[in-house]
């Protein structure tokens, strides 16, 4: 199936809707939770920080467990439905509970387990791409652009709903979106591996059920995670940690050191998110041609240059002019590594996607801690130098990926290195 004919596939259209709904759920909940805790249960800044830190740690563990278990299930849609409904339950909890510890428990149990939906969507996307005969980086980038669009419109809608009505209305809408996503997963998405009519069999398909090696499951979730995968994960954590530091630090830097309006930070983040949408698709389209490792190295160069320039930029036009560099590296970091991880763990898309999702959350957790430490001692502007250091180190790790031992590639007619791609 050609790339752009994908949109005529009913299963792909439903997957786009699911990705958009899940993206909006995250865009409604994540940016508003700190304000919700402060206004409804009078949480202190320390309590808010502990709330996010505890949830992040819990999500890392639940992502890995759900990912390993999902690879042994015959139908991944079961996990998608369950996690979407858990997100709905968490949103309902936010509408009725007004005790800090009850909200914390709800967040850990419902949103902690429900957050695994993010990684499972990656895994399902990979399986559907293989079944449709479409290159996975392009397909993944296409769907990630839908999530980015949700994050462009979601936060403004969320804060508008709070201003016009209340937190209750916002979280009821969040619960409804989660239920819609669950219904689409159950009755709109085909079983993973089902081929569209007229689609030739994928070259990686096995000849029979007995030819496919059974995934190791929960007790063996780290089986096959060798040096190559660990270096790749380290690079991802550093990149996403730098991104978290930037997003946390930017509003404080803009208002405290540049003395601009707080809306300026929202404008910068919004412009970058809009630019990311086409770049996500382009990164996916070019990943196999250029090579995933090369794209990651280019991304780290763009990121290091961007963060290295920020301390010297003092005007809004120049800040806006720098956003294409930011969007370019983020588009690669949010798309290519998850496909590379799936390539490094063939037959285990759930575990590989959970590793990426966990690395994403570990990067956010570590980035939040680093911002507080660096800003306290040196100021907000110096945080960007720390970001540049992290992305430069991520680039060095990406350089080592070629020489690191890696697992055998997936059985196919293409014998290129999973991170190198085809020769141009």
Could you say what each language-model-derived stretch is?
Residues 20, 101-118, 237, 318-332:
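Hydrophobic core of transmembrane alpha-helices in multi-pass small-molecule transporters
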Residues 347-378:
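A late C-terminal transmembrane helix in Major Facilitator Superfamily
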């Amino acid at each position: 199936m050609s790339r752009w004919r994908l949109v005529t596939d009913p299963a792909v259209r439903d997957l786009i809707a699911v990705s958009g709904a899940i993206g909006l759920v995250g865009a409604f909940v994540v940016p508003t939770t700190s304000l919700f805790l402060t206004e409804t249960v009078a949480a202190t800044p320390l309590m808010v920080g502990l709330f996010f830190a505890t949830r992040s740690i819990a999500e890392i563990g639940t992502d890995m467990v759900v990912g390993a278990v999902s690879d042994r299930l015959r139908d991944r849609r079961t996990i998608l439905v369950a996690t979407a409904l858990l997100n709905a339950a968490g949103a309902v909890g936010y509408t009725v509970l007004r005790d800090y510890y009850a909200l914390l428990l709800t967040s850990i149990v419902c949103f902690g387990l429900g957050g695994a939906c993010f990684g499972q969507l990656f895994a399902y996307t990979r399986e559907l791409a293989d079944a449709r005969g479409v290159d996975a980086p392009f397909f993944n980038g296409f769907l990630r652009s839908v999530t980015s669009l949700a994050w462009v419109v979601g936060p403004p809608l969320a804060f508008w709903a709070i201003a016009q009505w209340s937190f209750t209305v916002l979280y009821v809408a969040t619960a409804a979106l989660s239920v819609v996503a669950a219904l689409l997963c159950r009755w709109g998405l085909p079983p993973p591996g089902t081929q569209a009519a007229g689609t030739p069999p994928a070259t990686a398909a096995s000849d029979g059920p007995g030819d496919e090696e059974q995934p190791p499951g929960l007790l063996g979730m780290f089986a096959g995670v060798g040096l190559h995968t660990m270096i790749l994960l380290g690079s991802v954590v550093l990149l996403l940690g730098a991104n978290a530091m930037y997003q946390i630090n930017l509003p404080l830097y803009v208002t405290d050191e540049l003395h601009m309006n707080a809306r300026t930070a929202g404008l910068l983040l919004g412009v970058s998110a809009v630019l990311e949408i086409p770049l996500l698709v382009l990164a996916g389209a070019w990943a196999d041609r250029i090579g995933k490792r090369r794209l990651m190295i280019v991304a780290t160069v763009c990121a290091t240059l961007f963060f290295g320039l920020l301390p010297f930029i003092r005007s809004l036009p120049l800040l806006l002019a720098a956003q294409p560099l930011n969007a370019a590296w983020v588009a690669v970091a949010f798309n290519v590594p998850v496909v590379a991880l799936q390539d490094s763990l063939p037959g285990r898309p759930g575990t590989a996607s959970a590793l990426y999702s966990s690395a994403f959350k570990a990067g956010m957790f570590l980035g939040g801690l680093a911002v507080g430490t660096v800003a306290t001692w040196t100021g907000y502007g110096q945080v960007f130098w720390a970001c540049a250091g992290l992305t430069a180190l991520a680039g060095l790790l990406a350089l080592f990926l070629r020489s690191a031992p890696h697992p055998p590639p997936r059985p196919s007619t293409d014998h290129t290195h999973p991170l190198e791609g085809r020769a141009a």
